[in-house]
């Protein structure tokens, strides 16, 4: 009897030459971690695919989870049989029946080794004849068929599937180093974080809270965002920086039109220090060119010069509708639209500068002790840990997060 399995296809991982095995092992580990809630029997490599075997009644849900893991191009629910033609032909009938509506089909057989007595063309003909008998009202079509039945012969086994679901693609998390992301409870920064994770980066989010000048609602929403990204993208640690009092100090000391730039220079500087602690090589933000006053070219340059490490802005050329569509796709949009006062709305000027002059920015920067403020914020920084197989904690900054109430208390508070 044919067993249900998942065949995971990958594209970019397969292009990595001598490092291919390394990337495949990372992807396999990430798939195992994403399926921690499932009864997985094994995750292994077979002939350019990753094979996942599990409890059969979990097949559909497991496939949906695997699709969300960066590095996965496609997921196919397949039937696993032995080399008996009767077995794999029967599996082909089942696979095509599950495909959905179709008028035409084609069989595509592939052998990973040549010790099987039948050539690929013979398997195609053999399976095709059985399918023609099972579906007499459907036609065989060699070019652009509605359904393609794949028959993969690997060692002593045959895998048969007709339906594939697209994955998120990219590279497996943990294959491209570590970055610090500025994560708010808004729409943009969760998408930017996800996009860097999709390129293989381990993302370490830093959330600047308006506390104690605002409630800590945004801190809980950010935790919800991190949980929404899981299990496909697992974030191991969230840093929380209580920024409200420092914003108040800046609002008193600096010209009102330059407040936002000063806020962001401090945020970047703190993020850079955390990046050094974490061994991260870049900062990631959710900025999109021209979307708000702080995101003009002049203002981006004025903020960027406060740090030495690279700042990645994966959304810089995206419009709001594109960002919203992606947020809906990754499951963070509804959380991000919940009302939550945070540092982004605190002590905002009526007329923020849109084309900052560097001389004026430097003068404002010297109107308060920014170095002392950065050090103070670092000492006040707290963190929350989450389950993750890719995150490796640094040996410093061991302070826990005592201010946040347990999740159950927060739900009662709602």
Regions found by a protein language model. Give the residues of each.
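A conserved beta-strand->alpha-helix junction
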Residues: 226-253, 340-342
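Structural beta-sheet core signal
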Residues: 181, 205-207, 240, 285, ...
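A glycine-rich phosphate-binding loop feature that marks nucleotide/adenosyl-phosphate handling sites
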Residues: 48, 241-245, 288, 340-349
